């Protein structure tokens, strides 16, 4: 938000069209020319025609409901029986890839209760006691549901990821996009 505030202060005549949606498709939207700039998680491999500026890094966390349920009876154990725990995971986000890798490394085939689009859907379903989810801590911290969810102390922790802004290199030819990118660079240099 600070980036947008700085941009609006410096360039008040420029109108910003902001869309929210599934972060998993953010990089694809830039590649397809559907968006000039997107907020995205740093992918394991960034396509060579894209630029990425990290804004922050956030841990990925396992979350469970606070409300007593079958799920809490499993997650309250000192040794969580992961094969029995119903999981609510993103259909295709980086968080899903990291969760899959975490389970595979332990030889666990998780029980998938639901595959959803978007981290907010994971928060809602976990809150209801449907299962355990994996979300960026940043998403949990900003959620109105955070008091109804708890972070599980899981070792080893999932690999955190960087969140940043992504754009196609060709879009730097646009003065508006270039001005926004310069604000990002100025912020990173502060």
Regions found by a protein language model. Name each.
Residues 1-45, 116:
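Central regulatory/effector-binding core of bacterial HTH transcription factors
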Residues 47-58, 72-74, 120, 124-169:
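Beta-alpha-beta core module
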Residues 24, 43, 67, 94, ...:
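Alpha-helix/helix-capping structural signal
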Residues 13-17, 109-113, 162-164:
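Residues at or immediately flanking beta-strands
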Residues 70-78, 84-106, 173-177, 181:
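Secondary-structure junction motif
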Residues 27-28, 53, 78-80, 123-124, ...:
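Alpha-helical segments flanking ligand/cofactor-binding loops in enzyme cores
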Residues 14, 31-39, 60, 126-132, ...:
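Alpha-to-beta junction loops
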Residues 2, 152-190:
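A late-sequence structural motif
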């Amino acid at each position: 938000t600070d980036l947008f505030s700085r941009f609006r202060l410096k360039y008040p005549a420029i109108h910003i069209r902001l869309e929210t949606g599934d972060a998993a498709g953010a990089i694809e939207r830039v590649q397809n020319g559907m968006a000039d700039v997107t907020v995205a998680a740093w992918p394991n491999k960034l396509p060579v025609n894209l630029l990425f500026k990290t804004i922050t890094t956030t841990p990925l966390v396992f979350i469970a409901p606070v409300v007593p349920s079958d799920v809490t009876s499993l997650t309250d154990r000192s040794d969580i029986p992961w094969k029995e725990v119903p999981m609510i995971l993103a259909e295709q986000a980086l968080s899903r890839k990291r969760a899959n890798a975490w389970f595979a490394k332990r030889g666990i085939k998780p029980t998938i209760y639901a595959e959803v689009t978007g981290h907010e859907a994971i928060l809602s379903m976990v809150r209801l006691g449907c299962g355990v989810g994996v979300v960026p801590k940043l998403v949990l911290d900003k959620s109105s549901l955070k008091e109804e969810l708890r972070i599980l102390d899981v070792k080893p922790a999932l690999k955190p990821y960087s969140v940043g802004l992504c754009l196609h290199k060709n879009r730097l030819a646009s003065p508006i996009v270039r001005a926004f990118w310069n604000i990002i660079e100025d912020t990173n240099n502060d």
